[in-house]
């Protein structure tokens, strides 16, 4: 009877350790996005606890959404000076995101942060231009969301070791 209790205790201990480890991993994943300024924009993109992969996934999502915003701005840039400015800054942001993606592959965290900061700045120029000119446009909304996602990405990049 004593041998059976030891086996049960051993199996129970293993089960508790595995459960605790899985909860810790899940908590770390949730904490990765919880640390960002805009966690609701982070959770759909980040799929794990690795900051490097999270940053890479966010850069790819930013590139995709930036291309869509560029296409949208291209339709309206001839009729609105502020949209034309946004079009140019979105193109700059796309360039900086490409450089950031290459930097993460080369494991150059300093360059990665620099290019991400430049992209966030580009998005901010677009948003602030609309605010300064007292205009409201769908491009502004897209650029604001991109700015927030870029801010999250920049924070994720600081977690890379």
Regions of interest found by a model, annotated:
Residues 2-111, 115-161:
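Trafficking entry modules
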């Amino acid at each position: 009877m004593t041998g059976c209790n030891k086996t049960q205790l051993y199996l129970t201990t293993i089960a508790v350790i595995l459960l605790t480890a899985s909860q810790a991993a899940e908590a770390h994943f949730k904490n990765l996005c919880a640390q960002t300024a805009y966690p609701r924009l982070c959770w759909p993109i980040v799929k794990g606890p690795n900051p490097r992969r999270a940053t890479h996934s966010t850069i790819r999502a930013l590139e995709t959404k930036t291309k869509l915003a560029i296409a949208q701005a291209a339709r309206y840039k001839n009729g609105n000076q502020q949209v034309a400015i946004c079009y140019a800054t979105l193109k700059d942001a796309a360039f900086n995101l490409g450089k950031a993606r290459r930097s993460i592959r080369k494991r150059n965290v300093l360059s990665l942060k620099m290019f991400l900061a430049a992209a966030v700045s580009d998005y901010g120029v677009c948003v602030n231009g609309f605010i300064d000119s007292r205009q409201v446009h769908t491009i502004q909304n897209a650029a604001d969301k991109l700015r927030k996602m870029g801010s999250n990405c920049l924070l994720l990049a600081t977690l890379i070791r």
